[in-house]
């Protein structure tokens, strides 16, 4: 099916907003904000400077929106085929590819300028690397080249808490890299569960997702294995004394539930297990990071 790009309709501000994938950007900014808060020295000095809070997240959000707009351009043919995405602005021809690319460039330049002016160069360059990793490496190449696209390209999507942390400290350390590792390990079981649910759509669009190339049974096994890896990685903040007992208990409970869903999916023991595993994975990551944050601001010396 050819992409519908020959319709002549005036794009609206809503079309350009949709190009940025605002829901995804909001989720990224939540993890960026959590990274900023975790980088502070709570509870005595646990506040983020307002300039970094506002302009740091603004710059990161603008660059994330730029990467999303490039994704719309590159994936416009695929989007026109899949039921979930066929009404996107480029798939329906409401915005031209050249207009979307110009919009993406404008967002990227504005985001980089804001980050350089109000945070630090390391944050700006790491954000640019994340943008290029998602827009060029993942969207432009990996997505169509290998069923391991999500694993390799997941680093770009895992970057926001690192960016938020570095915006505060100005340097890299083990703690934000561990936050990246948690999201990196979470991404495959999260996305592969959705891919199983939408396997036929990905096959129709000729995207080599793991369930399409290797089958559902193989994919379910890898979801289970990655969930085990995630469970172990999620305990590392406690091991390195980044967090305390409150986080540990939450990580154990949340991880056990994730493993329960991954096992149910592998054994085919529950109806609609794939989409339910996908939905729980979102709840899992949100609550895990909330637990990190709550633990960070609690006077844990009274609890241990």
From Swiss-Prot:
Enzyme class: transferase
Any single biological process term in GO: heme O biosynthetic process
Record GO terms (molecular function): protoheme IX farnesyltransferase activity
CDD domains assigned to the protein according to its UniProt record, in alphabetical order: PT_UbiA_Cox10
UniProt topology in membrane: Multi-pass membrane protein
Mitochondrion keyword on record: no
Family matches, as InterPro entries: Protohaem_IX_farnesylTrfase, UbiA_prenyltransferase, UbiA_prenylTrfase_CS, UbiA_sf
Chief location category: membrane
Protein name in the entry: Protoheme IX farnesyltransferase 1
Organism: Pseudomonas aeruginosa (strain ATCC 15692 / DSM 22644 / CIP 104116 / JCM 14847 / LMG 12228 / 1C / PRS 101 / PAO1)
UniProt GO cellular component terms: plasma membrane
Pathway(s) of this molecule: Porphyrin-containing compound metabolism; heme O biosynthesis; heme O from protoheme: step 1/1
EC numbers: 2.5.1.141
